């Protein structure tokens, strides 16, 4: 529908078209994992460019190289300020920020700086032939007698979060909270997360939840509207978007 709207605006001689994609579709498919697979993230960007967009805006991309799929300006926003403010209010005591994978350590490090926290990550061994299947988990970092916050960009099946939260509890974490920008909550995830030893799951409204927070029971949904509004204001007044995040939107 958004592509159709872009086409309609282009045909109506719009001076400039900015497409806002709070959640970038197929962002995890930015490269081939197996032979004869599509690079779906690249296809999405090609479709928007072909439709006529002049600029794209998205929040917490799974991989930032997606910005290089288009020659047009591509603004990458982050919901991290929302999570920082939220956890400053609800967590009192020593904190460890845990990334569910090694690739998210940089994001976790920036997040930890604002909360004066330790940083760790979960090493996952995946089976490339089985979609969303993880063989084993290992926690790297100090979590004993600390409040652990699992920080990720996406919650999909919930398998990683459920398994990691149990390991963190076994390692002596005082509490386990989860912060993820995009709550996909695909089939089967509600049951996994409902049974997981997680105190609070915090996501944003980049995706429509359709009652999932109520089913899981301990989910808080934060609005990204202020972040998008401030970014669009900066874009249309020719101000710096990165300045809104003090450069910390480049992860």
Regions found by a protein language model. Name each.
Residues 1-251:
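PRPP-associated nucleotide enzymes
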């Amino acid at each position: 529908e958004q592509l159709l709207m872009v086409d309609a605006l282009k045909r109506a001689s719009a001076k400039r078209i900015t497409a806002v994609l709070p959640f970038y579709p197929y962002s995890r498919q930015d490269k081939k994992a197996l032979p004869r697979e599509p690079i779906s993230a690249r296809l999405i960007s090609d479709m928007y460019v072909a439709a006529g967009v002049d600029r794209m805006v998205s929040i917490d991309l799974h991989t930032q190289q997606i910005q290089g799929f288009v020659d047009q300006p591509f603004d990458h926003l982050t919901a991290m300020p929302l999570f920082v403010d939220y956890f400053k209010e609800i967590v009192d005591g020593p904190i460890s920020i845990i990334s569910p994978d090694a690739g998210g350590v940089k994001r976790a490090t920036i997040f930890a700086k604002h909360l004066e926290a330790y940083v760790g990550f979960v090493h996952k061994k995946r089976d490339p032939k089985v979609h969303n299947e993880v063989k084993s988990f290992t926690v790297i970092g100090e979590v004993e007698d600390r409040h652990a916050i699992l920080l990720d960009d996406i919650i999909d099946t919930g398998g990683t979060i459920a398994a990691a939260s149990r390991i963190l509890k076994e390692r002596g974490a005082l509490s386990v909270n989860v912060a993820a920008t995009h709550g996909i909550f695909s089939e089967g995830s509600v049951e996994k997360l409902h049974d997981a030893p997680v105190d609070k799951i915090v996501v944003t409204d980049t995706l429509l939840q359709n009652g999932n927070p109520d089913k899981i029971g301990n989910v808080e949904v934060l609005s990204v509207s202020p972040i998008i509004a401030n970014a669009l204001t900066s874009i249309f007044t020719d101000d710096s978007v990165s300045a809104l995040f003090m450069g910390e939107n480049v992860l």
